[in-house]
Amino acid sequence: MEKTTKNGIHRISQEGGKTIAWAEESGVKVLEKDGYYFKDLAKTGELLPYEDWRLSDEERAADLAGRLSIEEIAGLMLYSPHQAVPPMPGGPFQGTFDGKTYLESGKEPYAISDQQKEFLEDEHIRHILLTNVESPEISAKWSNELQKRAETLPYGIPINLSSDPRNGAKDSGAEFKSGGSEISKWPEGVGFAACFDPEVAGQFAKDASREYRALGITTALGPQIDLCTEPRWMRFVDTLGEEVEMSKKLTKAYCDGMQTTEGEADGWGKDSVNTMVKHWPGGGTGEAGRDAHYAFGQFAVYPTGNFEEHLKPFTEAAFHLDGPTDCASAVMPYYTVSYGVDKKNGKNVGNSYSEYLIKDLLRGKYEFKGIVCTDWGITQDPEKMIEGFGSRCYGVQDMTEAERCLLAITNGVDQFGGNSESGPIVEAYKIGCEKYGEKAMRERMELSAKRLLINIFHCGLFEDPYLDPEESAKIVGCEEFCRHGYEAQKKSIVLLKNSAKRAPEGQKGVLPLKKGLKVYIPERKIGPSKAFFRIDLPAKTEDPLPDGLPSKYGTRVASPEEADVALVFIESPACNPYSTEDLANGGNGYLPITLQYRPYTAKKAREVSIAGGDFRENFTNRSYLGKTNTAYNEADLDNILECRRAMGDKPVIVCATVNNPMVMHEFEAEADAIVAEFGVSRAAVLDVVFGGYNPTGRLPIQMPKDMDAVEEQSEDRALDMETYIDSEGHNYDYGYGMNYEGVLPAWKK
């Protein structure tokens, strides 16, 4: 046994037992029994079952759940709003300190805000969503402050910090940094699919779990395992692709890597992070590619009846892991109305409100025992305007908020994402007591409490929730993890074209470029657009390499005339799928989502939409047949064509950030080489372009022949699109890729 004290945290390491740690200021005492030490979290002076680390997590959680009041259980079923550390004035996530802004308060950046104290103490919240942090050390100190505060409160229930994916490399610079980063940088989800190697996703998960735990995070709101069979969906890049077998392999590798602590019999321990797989029953089939964050995109459709395939990443992977933790800890249903799927009740409602999808399938047929947590913001009253970014209580808008909560709870939902007020849940309990009886409702609430507590026990937080900030600073963004991430970035890059037409002597294609060349890189121009929250954004101009071209590669010049080569950075086309102007002019508001740059008129769209019907609309047909839309970033195409004209017989290299499949025929023939990447750093792209890495990535998607092919494919069917064949005869189908020597061998399952 070893006793230590550092920064006001007492810690006892026990041979043959669990290490326990507690804060001096929390008032917690230590109990000794049978030669072991335990924390007296309830401050009763006796060892209660939930305090006894010798018992199973299930036994401990059941004991504690039975001791909690309904108000305390309701608090466990909540999730805090997004928390930034510190919350800066003018940012999206505000906070005050003794009524003052952070900058006015003079507080340390890791101080607990007024709002955080309130939801810990008054609302009994123990699940907190972390966003931006000033540094790993500050995050660790803030986590410790939260855990100290929680330890002083009844039963000493620790905080379960969670995070959306935070290791994306897209905004990284043009030079790789081997260490000292804020966190290791990796490809986006579909980039892992482009590696065609599940071990890459597994390595990410192992490294990220260590970084998460060093930041205080014990739940990952991911992976996003929707089969993205609809190419226009705005969340395509976050998924693990559309091919079900690869998605299953990646899901297992990701969840096992995140949840498993090596050396623990059941897999759970100090390195474990709970995974919350999303989005049940699959959110990748939105009609015409629209997204259900918005009411105009609420419907998921299954034109070929392929619903069952979309369940497989959950039912055949996340729920049956290869590692010792066995199953993903939690599931998040999507906002969507899975249109026409519920044949039993005939109800088209948001997934969390669907008895068929949650109670009958998820809890019943597939026997999922973990947490079901709704997506963020589904219980409040809806926005008056259909394009508003508000509550998504699709199909149950006539209910009260408490009635919506009760419906979700009776279906099998345990937690409400984005809800930080316990009142509606307590009211739901009261309504349920009248409807089902107090005994039945108490048992149902305790069941959710038990599920939620098990995940906190799994991660060892009841014994030791405290971090060493100095150690956290060493772990997060360390050299080893950054190197792993950078290798994964390079491995995910796909070389689509490498023409021999302007290749240097001795090379089969124009890539790799020789170093020391003069390089022209045009600025990108993006027109007026809509932000994620549906806010209007003005037109802008941006430099793809704001820090300049690293001198080891060559010299950046101001014009094509001076250059030896042009390097054109583009992003896949993006557009606005809904127009209030169209609505005001007598239309229905719906526009085609275009995957091409030039104006697109939908001549082959459905005459009548599959799904429709909203209380804010006096029609059900959401068709956009005959309407035209244009990409915000149409000027990306102009850059390519202008460079081709200006460069004459000198090479033009296109580097495309692929957020969605894209129509290539507009520019492919004008490019000597095309490099596709899925959310990686400029440094990784330049490494491939200049010979630092011979590409190995393959397309995890299909590139469409044209927009007619996009309209003709089915939202629910994978790999069913007519694909583009380029000017050199290469088919941009799933699994296609090149290296410097030529086309990679054909992909086989």
Question: Which residue ranges define each predicted feature?
Answer:
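Glycoside hydrolase catalytic-domain context in secreted enzymes
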Residues: 1-749
